[in-house]
């Protein structure tokens, strides 16, 4: 996942979700 600070956690969740989306 990419991003900085807390935002990285948001992208991590998106990547783990199906169709990410």
From Swiss-Prot:
Protein species of origin: Aegilops tauschii subsp. strangulata
Pathway where it operates: Glycan biosynthesis; starch biosynthesis
EC top class, as a word: transferase
Recorded GO CC terms: amyloplast; chloroplast
Molecular functions per Gene Ontology: alpha-1,4-glucan glucosyltransferase (NDP-glucose donor) activity
BP term (GO), one: starch biosynthetic process
Subcellular location: Plastid, Chloroplast; Plastid, Amyloplast
Top-level taxon of the source organism: Eukaryota
Alphabetical keyword list: Amyloplast, Chloroplast, Glycosyltransferase, Plastid, Starch biosynthesis, Transferase
Similarity comment: Belongs to the glycosyltransferase 1 family. Bacterial/plant glycogen synthase subfamily.
EC number per UniProt: 2.4.1.242
Protein name, UniProt field: Granule-bound starch synthase 1
Swiss-Prot/TrEMBL catalytic activity: an NDP-alpha-D-glucose + [(1->4)-alpha-D-glucosyl](n) = [(1->4)-alpha-D-glucosyl](n+1) + a ribonucleoside 5'-diphosphate + H(+)
